[in-house]
Every structure is written in structure tokens, then in C-alpha cells.
Curated annotation (Swiss-Prot):
It is found in: Cytoplasm; Cytoplasm, Cytoskeleton, Microtubule organizing center, Centrosome, Centriole; Cytoplasm, Cytoskeleton, Cilium basal body; Cell projection, Cilium. Disulfide bonds: none annotated. InterPro entries: AH/BAR_dom_sf, BAR_CBAR1/2, CBAR/FAM92. Residues 10-220 are annotated as: BAR-like. Plays a critical role in regulating mitochondrial ultrastructure and function by maintaining the integrity of mitochondrial morphology, particularly the organization of cristae. Preferentially binds to negatively charged phospholipids like cardiolipin and phosphatidylinositol 4,5-bisphosphate enhancing its interaction with mitochondrial membranes. Induces membrane curvature and tubulation, which are critical for maintaining mitochondrial ultrastructure and the organization of cristae. Plays a crucial role in ciliogenesis. May play a role in limb development through its role in ciliogenesis. Homodimer (via BAR-like domain). Heterodimer with FAM92B (via BAR-like domains). Interacts (via BAR-like domain) with CBY1; this interaction is required for targeting FAM92A to centriole and cilium basal body. Interacts (via BAR-like domain) with CBY3; both proteins form a ninefold symmetric structure at the flagellar base; are recruited to the annulus in a mutually dependent manner and regulate annulus positionning. PANTHER family: CBY1-INTERACTING BAR DOMAIN-CONTAINING PROTEIN 1, CBY1-INTERACTING BAR DOMAIN-CONTAINING PROTEIN HOMOLOG. Residues 266-288 are annotated as: Disordered. The gene is CIBAR1. Belongs to the CIBAR family. This is CBY1-interacting BAR domain-containing protein 1. The BAR-like domain displays limited similarity to other BAR domains. Keywords: Cell projection, Cilium, Cilium biogenesis/degradation, Coiled coil, Cytoplasm, Cytoskeleton, Differentiation, Flagellum, Membrane, Mitochondrion, Mitochondrion inner membrane, Nucleus, Spermatogenesis, Transit peptide. It is a peripheral membrane protein.
């Protein structure tokens, strides 16, 4: 009867040991992966800082509107990296550290398991010794009584450590579930806060880029490229960019203007001829 009880408790202990081993394995993996996730996020922040610097350097070489738009974008993007830094710090404190703490917690539970196993092994050893004593010296009541006393002590110790282990593992399981809920809730909250801020910042950055006046910057570029004859070239470009209707109207205006000028020239020429004829008549009359 006692040996069957020992076997049942051994099976229970193995189950508790498997539970602790399972937590040790998977919490260790989760801790390593979350830590790598945080490191990757920190490296992304560092690369973003380099990108901000390069954008500012490039912006200083560009035309006014493009320069201002890029600098505003860089400012917003730099602001986002401040939020990313906060994300890294929070993930480290709220996710990685609690998982890392389970290394110590699991070690303590293994110590409890070890103490329980030691007590049960002692109990099993005393039971085996009592059975041998009864077989070898069935009539020696003193030796048998002494072996029974040792077994009773070992059983009491094993029962006490087993009860303590059961309570400890029960609390461990309860705390594990609570911690998992807390850790993953913190992870989701931190990520949501960051991405919410990121959406605001990216919206502002997008608006800054869209505000860049392409035409104004293009005129500034052309003026710097053709400082002397920029106006005439610009007129040519504008003329070439007119619609067919505008070009037709312009041609008609030019044609009408030419016809008016031709009529005026002909009229002036006719007037001059008439004046010359009048002068010739006057001279003839005087001679007569």
C-alpha cells in the first residue's frame, strides 16, 4: 500500500517537473526572441537617425521649397525616432525583463523539486530497508521497530516537502498565467502606442512633402541655370506650352496686325504720291 502511494507521488512529481521544464524551455525561447526583437528595433532607430542626417545634408543643397519640405520631413522623422526609443525602453522593461526573471523563478522551483525528490528517495530507501529487515530478521522486533521509526520520519518529511511543492507549483502555475497575460498585454499596448504616434507623425511628414511647390522650384532652377536670357527662354517655353486654341488666336492676332500695318503703309505711300503730283502741277503753272 505504501509503495503504491510512493509510485503515485513519484508520477505527480514527474508531472510537476515537466511543467517547470516546459516553462523553462519556452520562456527562455520567448525571452531570447523578444530581446532580439528589441535589438532589431533599436538598430532600426539607429538607421533612421542616419537617414535623418543624410536628408538634412541633401536638403541644404536643394532649391527653397524642396529644401524646406525635406527639412520638415526630417524633423518629423526624427521625432518618430524619439517615440521608437521610448518603445525600445518600454519593451525592455515590460517584456524582456519579466521573461528574464523566470530564469531565477524556475531555478527556485527546481530546488523545491530537488528537495522533494530527495525526501521521497529517502522514504523509498527506508521502506526497502524495512522490508529487508523483516525478511532477514522477522523475530528481531527491536531492529524492525527502529526501521519502522526511520521510515515514519522519512515519510513525514516526504509528505511535508510534497505538500510544499504542490502549493509552490500551484502558485507558480497561477503566477505564470497571470504574467503571460500581463507581458503580452504590455507588448500590445506599447506597440499600439508607438504605431498610433507613428501614424500621426507620418501624416504630418506626408503633408510636408506634398506642400513642395514644384513649379516655383523649377523656375528657381531655370533662373540659376540661365541667369541672363532666362526671361526670353521662359517666354519661349510658355509659348510652346500654349494649347492649340491659344496658338490659333495668337496667329490670328499677328495676321490682323500685319494687315493693318500693310494698309497703313499703302495709304501713306498713296498720300506721298498725291503730294508729289500736286507739287508738279504748281511748278508747271508758274512756268506758264
Amino acid at each position: 500500500m505504501l509503495r503504491r502511494s510512493l509510485e503515485n507521488r513519484d508520477a505527480q512529481t514527474r508531472q510537476l517537473q515537466d511543467a517547470v521544464t516546459n516553462v523553462e524551455k519556452h520562456f527562455g525561447e520567448l525571452c531570447q526572441i523578444f530581446a532580439a526583437y528589441v535589438r532589431k528595433t533599436a538598430r532600426l532607430r539607429d538607421k533612421a537617425d542616419l537617414l535623418v542626417n543624410e536628408i538634412n545634408v541633401y536638403a541644404s543643397t536643394e532649391t527653397p521649397h524642396l529644401k524646406q519640405g525635406l527639412k520638415n520631413f526630417a524633423d518629423e522623422f526624427a521625432k518618430l525616432q524619439d517615440y521608437r526609443q521610448a518603445e525600445v525602453e518600454r519593451l525592455e522593461a515590460k517584456v524582456v525583463e519579466p521573461l528574464k526573471a523566470y530564469g531565477t523563478i524556475v531555478k527556485m522551483k527546481r530546488d523545491d523539486l530537488k528537495a522533494t525528490l530527495t525526501a521521497r528517495n529517502r522514504e523509498a530507501k527506508q521502506l526497502t530497508q524495512l522490508e529487508r529487515t523483516r525478511q532477514r530478521n522477522p523475530s528481531d522486533r527491536h531492529v524492525i521497530s527502529q526501521a519502522e521509526t526511520e521510515l515514519q520520519r522519512a515519510t513525514m518529511d516526504a509528505t511535508r516537502t510534497t505538500r510544499h511543492l504542490e502549493e509552490t507549483i500551484d502558485n507558480f502555475e497561477k503566477q505564470k498565467i497571470k504574467d503571460i497575460k500581463t507581458i503580452f498585454s504590455e507588448f500590445i499596448t506599447i506597440e499600439m502606442l508607438f504605431h498610433g504616434k507613428a501614424l500621426e507623425v507620418y501624416t504630418a511628414a506626408y503633408q510636408n512633402i506634398q506642400k513642395i511647390d514644384e513649379e516655383e522650384d523649377l523656375e528657381v532652377f531655370r533662373h540659376s541655370l540661365y541667369p541672363q536670357d532666362y526671361s526670353s527662354r521662359l517666354d519661349i517655353v510658355r509659348a510652346n506650352s500654349k494649347s492649340p486654341l491659344q496658338r490659333s488666336l495668337s496667329a490670328k492676332c499677328v495676321s490682323g496686325t500685319g494687315q493693318v500695318l500693310t494698309c497703313r503703309l499703302r495709304k501713306d505711300h498713296q498720300t506721298e504720291d498725291d503730294d508729289e503730283e500736286d507739287e508738279d502741277l504748281d511748278v508747271t503753272e508758274e512756268e506758264n
